[in-house]
Amino acid sequence: EALRSRYLDNGMLDFLLKEREAGRIRNLGFSYHGDIEVFDYLLSRHDELKWNFVQIQLNYVDWRHAKEVNTRNTDAEYLYAELVKRNIPAVIMEPLLGGRLSRLNDHLMARLKQRRPQESVASWAFRFAGTFPDVLTVLSGMTYMEHLQDNLRTFSPLVPCTEEEF
């Protein structure tokens, strides 16, 4: 209902499509937040609308356990697979699950450090999100210079997660 009233019935989506056609919008997409019916509906119109990207929440918890975090969420594995089927690039939000994946308990941190002692805990989450081939970009909120430096080490160049690490 919100999609219909905010973007469809008032002509907003038609306006955005015309702006893209006129060259004032280069890439048109949407950010998905929760309602799977809306996600599926918008993707079902991809042949007509030609989405340039879709922003989804993807991290190693939400990959198969999204509903355990929030019952309204959909597993990122499903969301990503639907984008891949349609050749729509994914923009990734929440790779750290609101920072929670950068602050693990001692047992989990020790397991990660045992495998890759030089890497931060956050870098594991970024590497996971960046491993998938149809990911256009991974968004990262950075507050401090050390966050930026860690991100540069993680993504320059990105070392994808191995099968074992998955």
Question: What do the PLM-derived regions correspond to, one by one?
Answer:
Residues E1-F166:
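Beta/alpha (TIM)-barrel catalytic core signal, keyed to glycine-rich beta->alpha loops juxtaposed to Asp/Glu
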